Amino acid sequence: MGRRGKKKGRPVSGWVVLDKPVGMGSTEAVSKIKWLFQAEKAGHAGTLDPLASGMLPIALGEATKTVPYVQDGAKIYRFTVAWGQERSTDDLEGPVTKSSDLRPAEAEVKALLPKYTGVIMQTPPQFSAIKIAGERAYDLAREGETVDIPAREIEIGRLDIIEHHADHTVFEVECGKGTYVRSLARDMGRDLGCFGHISDLRRVEVEPFTSEDFVTIAELEAARFGAQGEDKPEPADDADAIDVPVDFGAIDALLVDTSAALDCLPQIAISDDAATKIRLGNPVIIRGRDAPVEAEEACATARGKLVAIGAIEQGMFKPKRVFAG
């Protein structure tokens, strides 16, 4: 008897702007979403720690080609720093490594904010996904090693105090790619002489998505299984498709269009004939009074549908990344 082949997922495309719950890892979330949609491909646009909640944009199908544009977008976090303790993981998960009876006044915290605004150098946490000699820093840290992680340049657009209390402060930060909020808590605690760690972390925005795009696991399950409720099937370990005919219309309606990730690029409307040529990898002349002559990157669309990302050189659109029609 021949071996049964692994089933191929659906060619569904779009973004799931998941409101990830505390306790779920980013990889686990991607597997869950891929299974719910029975998608052929899936990937996320920036890890969110299991102890954090909030926005985890997950790309399905053709949308995976736009992941780098979301990864480069600004992010907004709301987080709480508990004063008086530094922990090995810089959050609640690790043991206490340093402690202090000192607690900062709001004026002291406020005076520190300019130091952490703008382009700054930041050292990632020991427990991070940074690679050191080919190994993840968190793997080395779990083995008891203290590794030398070089500081790197990051950008913080703003850092605001939302609430201040005797033993903790709630902040909101808008930051660029590569920023570790846990490092912010650690470094501010050291500067204030009282130590600190993250006790609550929520990502509220990843450009270009907003909280209006949020969808929860419960909402996705309701759309996928409807009246099945608690009798819904559980995902297999390999996330293969289930052998039950399914209407995916309700859950697919919760997807954000693939093109939403490319709002940062110029949009060029082209004809159906031009779209056919581009999908075959051929350059086309861009027509129209307002068409740009030069652009490092632009999106070509036909009838409102994304066709390709490419460069415009001397009035010619040259595709770099083509999307299925």
Curated annotation (Swiss-Prot):
One of its GO terms (molecular function) is RNA binding. Its EC number is 5.4.99.25. The keyword tRNA processing applies. Keywords: Isomerase, tRNA processing. The gene is truB. Gene3D superfamilies: Pseudouridine synthase. This is tRNA pseudouridine synthase B. Disulfide bonds: none annotated. Responsible for synthesis of pseudouridine from uracil-55 in the psi GC loop of transfer RNAs. Pfam families: TruB_C_2, TruB_N. Belongs to the pseudouridine synthase TruB family. Type 1 subfamily.
